[in-house]
Amino acid sequence: MSDIEIAQANEATAMWPITKVAAGLGLSEDDLELYGKAKAKLSFSALNALKDKPFGKLVLVTSINPTPAGEGKSTITVGLGDALQQRGKHPVIALREPSLGPVMGMKGGATGGGYAQVVPMEDINLHFTGDMHALTTAVDTLAALIDNHLQQGNTLNIDPRRILWKRALDINDRALRHVTIGLGGPTSGVPREDGFDITVASELMAVLCLAENIADLKARIGRIVIGYTYDRQPVTVADLKVTGAIAMLLRDALKPNLVQTLEHTPAFIHGGPFANIAHGCNSVLATRTALQLGDIAITEAGFGADLGGEKFMDIKTPVLGKTPDAVVIVATVRALKYNGGVALKDLQTENVEALAQGFDNLKRHIHSMQSYGVPVVVAINRFTSDTDAEIQFLIDACAKLNVKAVTATVWADGGRGGLAVADAVLAALDQPAHFTRLYDPQSDVKTKIKTIVQKIYGGADVDYEGKANSALRTIVKNGWQDLPVCMAKTQYSLTDNAKTLGAPEGFTIHVRDIIPKLGAGFLVVMTGSVLTMPGLPKVPAALNMDVTDDGKISGLF
């Protein structure tokens, strides 16, 4: 059966009312804002009541560089939560919520798969509780207010050529990357070049995911730099005097969403920045709540350890106030063979030699996560085409690095298929973690970037081209150089070239621009040809989707 067929079959008979799931966490119905029987948001009063509660253990799930189809990181995260519950623990899962772009495009949703899913799967993958729509509305409201300011006299002296703020849409639409607005004469606005980002790449998504409460949300929104004046001074949302209006639109979106797995493990799904063009982690509020309500919180960071993993460590943990007690790196035989040079069409054929070549990619990610001083476990997400020889090679190769590697079959078997991973994680949690920061936040921007390139990617140098050098001068001039850096880079490679696979060394990362995101609290470093508005593939997943006359959805994976 497909993911949606499994979800539909189980939702009808086994899904608990969300009030029952919440009761298992010690929450009453008064702590919830219900969205039907299966979804709820936590109220601000419930969040405030938890603020002094101690944290449990934190497990971060990340991965190697993936194939275009993804390697099942969310599936492993869900399955691990279910497996830990079977071991008598009280885990709480914290995931990002899906963007419609990948849902309608190629990669799929973010609810796991098979018998390791969060439900209601259709709702979560589509409109859920409306968070993405609220974010899109807030982004576009701010854009409209900026253009209205230009039209109504421009008292802030904003230079239309230097506006940074873009509009947003939660779908892949390459035709909107570069647009001209304000056409049609004097009553239709000030003509200027503009563009659209996908909603999850907008700074407001990062702000939502890093904000600790309404006051912090407003402070972060107010700091957002929307552009520059004619004399090149930064203009913020606070300067426009619309901080309160934008925060108002995001009031409910700030509250974490509570759902459940097919095995009733509680899961907070909240916020969804991409890891290749943003910081790739779910909200601080959701992760913090999971830490306070369970004895083990399991969360994931987008794409590989070079992207979401690094950003979780260097951007999210300082705000969260908690570092991981263990890291799980998800690997698949097919992705390692892909990194070893095997074509996509041949990945189901046994090839231990290519697997050995591709193993260097996993080795690089293991070393990068170990450099933070945290115990590492490798979870091999097993597919039916994997052979015993290939699996044994991976287990033995990891053992030579003193890393425990175990297989998982959670897609087919649910939590039962993740018990080996759960046991390895529990053993890792018994080891001491001595967290070490990758770089000093007070170091200069170039030093921070080069440190990531050398210590995480395995590269040698950084080349600054295009707008990057003038952007650096602006950052230093305005005193923003102490912010952490958020690398925008292809997810398919450790380099900035998606076609360079494996674990190359001695390469140069090409930085074309550095964009200050003062609300989020980091500097986005644009490398290679990465885009903040993706395009749909030649054969979008949307072509296989439908809804019957009685409202039953099909084709959603």
Curated annotation (Swiss-Prot):
It catalyses: (6S)-5,6,7,8-tetrahydrofolate + formate + ATP = (6R)-10-formyltetrahydrofolate + ADP + phosphate. InterPro entries: Formate_THF_ligase, Formate_THF_ligase_CS, P-loop_NTPase. SUPFAM superfamilies: P-loop containing nucleoside triphosphate hydrolases. ATP binds at T67, P68, A69, G70, E71, G72, K73, S74. Pfam families: FTHFS. Signal peptide: none annotated. GO terms for biological process: tetrahydrofolate interconversion. Keywords: ATP-binding, Ligase, Nucleotide-binding, One-carbon metabolism. Its EC number is 6.3.4.3. GO terms for molecular function: ATP binding; formate-tetrahydrofolate ligase activity. Belongs to the formate--tetrahydrofolate ligase family. NCBIfam families: PRK13505.1. This is Formate--tetrahydrofolate ligase. It comes from Lacticaseibacillus paracasei (strain ATCC 334 / BCRC 17002 / CCUG 31169 / CIP 107868 / KCTC 3260 / NRRL B-441). The lineage of its organism: Bacteria, Bacillati, Bacillota, Bacilli, Lactobacillales.
